[in-house]
Amino acid sequence: MNFNHHFTWSLVIISQIFQVQAGFGDPREALLEIQQKHGKPCDCAGGYVSSPPTNSLTTVSCSTYTAYSVTNSLKWQCVSTPTTASPTHIGSCPSQCNSQSYDSVHATCYNHYQQCTIGNKTYLTATMIRDKSPSSGDGNVPTILGNNQNLIIAGCPENKKGQVVCWNSQPSVHMSDGGGPQDKVREIIVNKKFEELHKSLFPELSYHPLALPEARGKEKIDAHTFDLLATVHSLLNVSSQRQLAEDCWLCLRSGDPVPLALPYDNTSCSNSTFFFNCSNCSCLITPPFLVQPFNFTHSVCLYADYQNNSFDIDVGLAGFTNCSSYINISKPSSPLCAPNSSVFVCGNNKAYTYLPTNWTGSCVLATLLPDIDIIPGSEPVPIPAIDHFLGRPKRAIQFIPLVIGLGITTAVSTGTAGLGVSLTQYTKLSHQLISDVQAISSTIQDLQDQVDSLAEVVLQNRRGLDLLTAEQGGICLALQEKCCFYANKSGIVRDKIKNLQDDLEKRRKQLIDNPFWTGFHGLLPYVMPLLGPLLCLLLVLSFGPIIFNKLMTFIKHQIESIQAKPIQVHYHRLEQEDHGGSYLNLT
């Protein structure tokens, strides 16, 4: 009895020590695998399509194209935004513009559009290619314009497919055309108002010294970029995927940066007093910049009512998430400042660090992460330092998004701070990224205010990065429109590519010094890829007829031996039985 008692308690203790996952494995690992497969919105893992999918969960604006999360595969498919047929020419509007025009038309309703004028008013005109119903807000939640005017996303004119229609060039308040020309006009208007606001709060000096770009060596990197990469690498060192930090490549996307926006994990921001009595809020005014909303499902949304069309700053509606609850910030007495390390993400997924008193629209609070991908060191990467003598097919490189490498996606999805590092530890990286955006925008603005000849330099350095590719002897390795930096246990290795290039250069010199390799006046490297197929063809032509004749002879002998073989009939004598006596009886 005593033995059974101890045995029972031993089983209880062991069951508490070892964690058992029921089912087919850890669901967090499955979620991580799914998110890695689907990728980020602007990566377009589902490819580029000509028309938007019929069923999609959410949409994300990516500047020149729109990403759709397809229902059946959950991969992001991208559709290019329509372009103007003639950007410099404004013609006359069709006659039907006099009788009928629309407030807004969705960008997926046409492929190209054109500006036109009639009666001193500018319209947009295009030929409709599809039908689409407008989408409205729910009647049981607060809306910006009230329940009677809660239109959010414009649609296509009804029964106008194949016909030319006209609509206003100026955007309507709180109505989006899906990343079309009206949304672009709204962004320009908002940017100008923020520039005016910034100049009024921080007056410029009357004299600016000439700002010339700093000449950097081939092995130098922009300070902001290096600090950002170093911070990311330090986070990898303390995350659940710390083995990646020992040997990996950190890849930045070339072009304008589009950071990832994650839901702000703070339950204290569920009421308006959190924003107006915020002790860690700094009113840092930055121009609105594009972000990629990631893992937004049900969020606490901020909204401000429409007040006056001539003075309000319409930041649009956050259509990439479902608002589970709303916080009314209408007619605030003071500007709204985002807490440190966070931003307001509003319509067309534009991020703001500061919202003035006359803003209107709806936004959500988010934390930023840089759009950085990781390549494990075990993954072979091409080093474009020398010409390859033998043709090799290019293989796809498997990039791991930073948000997955740090284990943030599973922590956000499960509502925990688990998988290695708490979400609060990423605030430093988000704050650094926001400050970097501010520094880049300030530098660009200073350069734009100077000599016109620097305009091209400004555009080339829009990112604030000095990205020199491997062909130029720099520290950046260009892979699939990304710039990759090598890192190990000690941090970012500045001379990794240079060492690889030196090794490859030594091998090339060894090949050049080999007389066999330099034979035929240097034509041998180009003949070598053909030697394999030529040798195979020569072997076939040489031994093919012999093998064929041997095979035919063998088959012929087999047939002849079968034909010459006599047919044997197997039989045996029948035994006679003796019944009774003899048939002849001699007397």
UniProtKB/Swiss-Prot annotation:
Specify the domain of life of the species encoding this protein.
Viruses
The sequence motif named YXXL motif is recorded at 571-574
Modification after translation is described as: Specific enzymatic cleavages in vivo yield mature proteins. Envelope glycoproteins are synthesized as an inactive precursor that is N-glycosylated and processed likely by host cell furin or by a furin-like protease in the Golgi to yield the mature SU and TM proteins. The cleavage site between SU and TM requires the minimal sequence [KR]-X-[KR]-R. The R-peptide is released from the C-terminus of the cytoplasmic tail of the TM protein upon particle formation as a result of proteolytic cleavage by the viral protease. Cleavage of this peptide is required for TM to become fusogenic. The CXXC motif is highly conserved across a broad range of retroviral envelope proteins. It is thought to participate in the formation of a labile disulfide bond possibly with the CX6CC motif present in the transmembrane protein. Isomerization of the intersubunit disulfide bond to an SU intrachain disulfide bond is thought to occur upon receptor recognition in order to allow membrane fusion.
| Keywords, in A-Z order | Cleavage on pair of basic residues, Coiled coil, Disulfide bond, Fusion of virus membrane with host cell membrane, Fusion of virus membrane with host membrane, Glycoprotein, Host cell membrane, Host membrane, Host-virus interaction, Membrane, Signal, Transmembrane, Transmembrane helix, Viral attachment to host cell, Viral envelope protein, Viral penetration into host cytoplasm, Virion, Virus entry into host cell
Any coiled-coil regions, as ranges: 420-470, 480-516
GO BP of this protein: fusion of virus membrane with host plasma membrane; symbiont entry into host cell; virion attachment to host cell
| Span(s) of short sequence motif CXXC | 248-251
Report residue spans for region: Fusion peptide.
399-419
Pfam families in the cross-refs:
TLV_coat
Where are the disulfide bridges?
Answer: C248-C251, C248-C484, C476-C483
GO CC list: host cell plasma membrane; membrane; viral envelope; virion membrane
- Statement: the UniProt record of this protein carries the keyword Acetylation: no
Question: So which stretches are on the Extracellular side?
Answer: 23-527
- Give ranges for the Cytoplasmic compartment: 549-587
Instruction: Report motif location: CX6CC.
Output: 476-484
Region described as Immunosuppression: spans on this chain? 459-475
Q: Which residues form the signal peptide?
A: 1-22
Segments spanning the bilayer are 528-548
> What the protein does?
The surface protein (SU) attaches the virus to the host cell by binding to its receptor. This interaction triggers the refolding of the transmembrane protein (TM) and is thought to activate its fusogenic potential by unmasking its fusion peptide. Fusion occurs at the host cell plasma membrane.
Q: How does it assemble?
A: The mature envelope protein (Env) consists of a trimer of SU-TM heterodimers attached by a labile interchain disulfide bond.
Domain notes from UniProt: The YXXL motif is involved in determining the exact site of viral release at the surface of infected mononuclear cells and promotes endocytosis.
What name is this protein filed under?
A: Envelope glycoprotein
> Which gene holds the coding sequence for this protein?
env
